[in-house]
């Protein structure tokens, strides 16, 4: 093992200790807004509310059972579109979507053979490591924080924790991230083969099928030579159908990208020789959802997701969940 590798190994242990010593609640900003949807809400209405509030997910609440009922994400809309787009009568399918309620989402997943997401959550005052491990085990990109009233036993939705917020919290509070200097191509991290890609001419619906079948949140857009041009994300689908115009799904990716909002976070790239210290610095200063690994000619070589980074950080023999220490000397990830 080289000195750089030895240093990185020691840094990982320090970062893991930091994660175990903090709670999920510590990651939350001082003030924030939480939007919760009742499961009786129409899918069409929920889509409009997500767009209006510029959010991509929301906790679900079953008011009849008085308990947390899961998390609404872009994957749910992708599954609904795939299910109804396969209908023999497209006009009837569109009319049915308009009458569809959130409580029917699990039935849609069953019919298209999609794996239903686990209704997982963690207590906000438990170790942040518990949240990281739960997200990794379920392959979730975010996890709800649920408290329970000690007297009534009623569940209370506190917030939703995302991979990005956790990694930004680490980047802001762990100086050890500057010691992660092993190049990506010398680490077991990321996806480097069998990449799902599309071209500017690919129909949006074909990209939606990729998103649903591969359980991914984005598809890189490349040209005939494999050069990275753009990315089509599941959130782009939300903006495309927000007005109820499902005919937009027949557009090409190139046409659909012209309808993308101006606040798009951009396409983040890196090289195979880049290191996690620089990537954590990027996460600290920019809203990064994933990084596309490219060569000097921008030819796509691999994809590094936030899940890849978080899993690399937490998976070690020292990742046993611990009892958080009570410390206030850190910054929340706003």
From Swiss-Prot:
<keyword id="KW-0067">ATP-binding</keyword>
<keyword id="KW-0539">Nucleus</keyword>
<feature type="binding site">
    <location>
        <begin position="305"/>
        <end position="308"/>
    </location>
    <ligand>
        <name>AMP</name>
    </ligand>
</feature>
<keyword id="KW-0129">CBS domain</keyword>
<feature type="binding site">
    <location>
        <position position="196"/>
    </location>
    <ligand>
        <name>ATP</name>
    </ligand>
</feature>
<dbReference type="GO" id="GO:0005737">
    <property type="term" value="C:cytoplasm"/>
</dbReference>
<feature type="binding site">
    <location>
        <begin position="305"/>
        <end position="308"/>
    </location>
    <ligand>
        <name>ADP 2</name>
    </ligand>
</feature>
<feature type="domain" description="CBS 2">
    <location>
        <begin position="115"/>
        <end position="177"/>
    </location>
</feature>
<dbReference type="GO" id="GO:0005634">
    <property type="term" value="C:nucleus"/>
</dbReference>
<feature type="binding site">
    <location>
        <position position="191"/>
    </location>
    <ligand>
        <name>ADP 2</name>
    </ligand>
</feature>
<dbReference type="GO" id="GO:0030295">
    <property type="term" value="F:protein kinase activator activity"/>
</dbReference>
<dbReference type="GO" id="GO:0031588">
    <property type="term" value="C:nucleotide-activated protein kinase complex"/>
</dbReference>
<feature type="binding site">
    <location>
        <begin position="217"/>
        <end position="218"/>
    </location>
    <ligand>
        <name>AMP</name>
    </ligand>
</feature>
<dbReference type="GO" id="GO:0005524">
    <property type="term" value="F:ATP binding"/>
</dbReference>
<feature type="binding site">
    <location>
        <position position="191"/>
    </location>
    <ligand>
        <name>AMP</name>
    </ligand>
</feature>
<feature type="binding site">
    <location>
        <begin position="287"/>
        <end position="289"/>
    </location>
    <ligand>
        <name>ADP 1</name>
    </ligand>
</feature>
<comment type="function">
    <text>Adenine nucleotides-binding subunit gamma of AMP-activated protein kinase (AMPK), an energy sensor protein kinase that plays a key role in regulating cellular energy metabolism. In response to reduction of intracellular ATP levels, AMPK activates energy-producing pathways and inhibits energy-consuming processes: inhibits protein, carbohydrate and lipid biosynthesis, as well as cell growth and proliferation. AMPK acts via direct phosphorylation of metabolic enzymes, and by longer-term effects via phosphorylation of transcription regulators.</text>
</comment>
<dbReference type="GO" id="GO:0006357">
    <property type="term" value="P:regulation of transcription by RNA polymerase II"/>
</dbReference>
<feature type="binding site">
    <location>
        <position position="141"/>
    </location>
    <ligand>
        <name>ATP</name>
    </ligand>
</feature>
<dbReference type="GO" id="GO:0043609">
    <property type="term" value="P:regulation of carbon utilization"/>
</dbReference>
<feature type="binding site">
    <location>
        <position position="141"/>
    </location>
    <ligand>
        <name>AMP</name>
    </ligand>
</feature>
<dbReference type="GO" id="GO:0043531">
    <property type="term" value="F:ADP binding"/>
</dbReference>
<comment type="subunit">
    <text>AMPK is a heterotrimer of an alpha catalytic subunit (ssp2), a beta (amk2) and a gamma non-catalytic subunits (cbs2). Forms a dimer of trimers.</text>
</comment>
<dbReference type="Pfam" id="PF00571">
    <property type="entry name" value="CBS"/>
</dbReference>
<dbReference type="GO" id="GO:0019887">
    <property type="term" value="F:protein kinase regulator activity"/>
</dbReference>
<feature type="domain" description="CBS 4">
    <location>
        <begin position="262"/>
        <end position="319"/>
    </location>
</feature>
<dbReference type="GO" id="GO:0007165">
    <property type="term" value="P:signal transduction"/>
</dbReference>
<dbReference type="InterPro" id="IPR000644">
    <property type="entry name" value="CBS_dom"/>
</dbReference>
<feature type="binding site">
    <location>
        <position position="141"/>
    </location>
    <ligand>
        <name>ADP 2</name>
    </ligand>
</feature>
<feature type="binding site">
    <location>
        <position position="290"/>
    </location>
    <ligand>
        <name>ATP</name>
    </ligand>
</feature>
<feature type="binding site">
    <location>
        <position position="196"/>
    </location>
    <ligand>
        <name>ADP 2</name>
    </ligand>
</feature>
<feature type="binding site">
    <location>
        <begin position="162"/>
        <end position="165"/>
    </location>
    <ligand>
        <name>ADP 1</name>
    </ligand>
</feature>
<feature type="binding site">
    <location>
        <begin position="303"/>
        <end position="308"/>
    </location>
    <ligand>
        <name>ATP</name>
    </ligand>
</feature>
<feature type="binding site">
    <location>
        <begin position="217"/>
        <end position="218"/>
    </location>
    <ligand>
        <name>ADP 2</name>
    </ligand>
</feature>
<dbReference type="GO" id="GO:0045722">
    <property type="term" value="P:positive regulation of gluconeogenesis"/>
</dbReference>
<dbReference type="GO" id="GO:0010514">
    <property type="term" value="P:induction of conjugation with cellular fusion"/>
</dbReference>
<comment type="similarity">
    <text>Belongs to the 5'-AMP-activated protein kinase gamma subunit family.</text>
</comment>
<dbReference type="InterPro" id="IPR050511">
    <property type="entry name" value="AMPK_gamma/SDS23_families"/>
</dbReference>
<keyword id="KW-0963">Cytoplasm</keyword>
<feature type="domain" description="CBS 3">
    <location>
        <begin position="187"/>
        <end position="247"/>
    </location>
</feature>
<keyword id="KW-0804">Transcription</keyword>
<dbReference type="GO" id="GO:0016208">
    <property type="term" value="F:AMP binding"/>
</dbReference>
């Amino acid at each position: 093992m080289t000195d750089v590798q030895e240093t990185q190994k020691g840094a990982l242990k320090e970062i893991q200790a930091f994660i175990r010593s903090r709670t999920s609640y510590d990651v939350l900003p001082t003030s924030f807004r939480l939007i919760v949807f009742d499961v009786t809400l129409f899918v069409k209405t929920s889509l409009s509310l997500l767009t209006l509030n510029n959010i991509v997910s929301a906790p679900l609440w079953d008011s009849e059972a008085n308990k947390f009922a899961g998390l609404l994400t872009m994957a749910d809309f992708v599954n609904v579109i795939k299910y109804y787009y396969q209908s023999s009568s497209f006009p009837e399918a569109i009319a049915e979507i308009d009458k569809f309620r959130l409580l029917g989402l699990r039935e849609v997943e069953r019919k298209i053979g999609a794996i239903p997401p686990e209704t997982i959550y963690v207590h906000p005052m438990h170790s942040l490591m518990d949240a990281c491990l739960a997200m990794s085990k379920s392959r979730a990109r975010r996890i709800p924080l649920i408290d329970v009233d000690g007297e009534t036993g009623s569940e209370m939705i506190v917030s939703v924790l995302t991979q990005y917020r956790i990694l930004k919290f680490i980047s802001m509070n762990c100086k050890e991230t500057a010691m992660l200097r092993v190049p990506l191509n010398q680490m077991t991290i990321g996806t480097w083969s069998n990449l799902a890609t599309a071209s500017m001419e690919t129909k949006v619906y074909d990209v939606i099928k990729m998103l649903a079948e591969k359980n991914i949140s984005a598809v890189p857009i490349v040209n005939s030579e494999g050069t990275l041009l753009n990315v089509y994300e599941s959130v782009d689908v939300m903006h495309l159908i927000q007005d109820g115009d499902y005919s937009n799904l027949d557009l090409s990716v190139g046409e659909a990208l012209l309808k993308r909002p101006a606040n798009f976070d951009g396409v983040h790239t890196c090289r195979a020789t880049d290191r996690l210290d620089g990537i954590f610095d990027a996460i600290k200063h920019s809203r990064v959802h994933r990084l596309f690994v490219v060569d000097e000619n921008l030819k796509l070589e691999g994809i590094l997701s936030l899940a890849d980074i978080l899993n690399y950080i937490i998976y070690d023999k020292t990742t046993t969940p611990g009892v958080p220490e009570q410390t206030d000397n850190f910054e929340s990830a706003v």
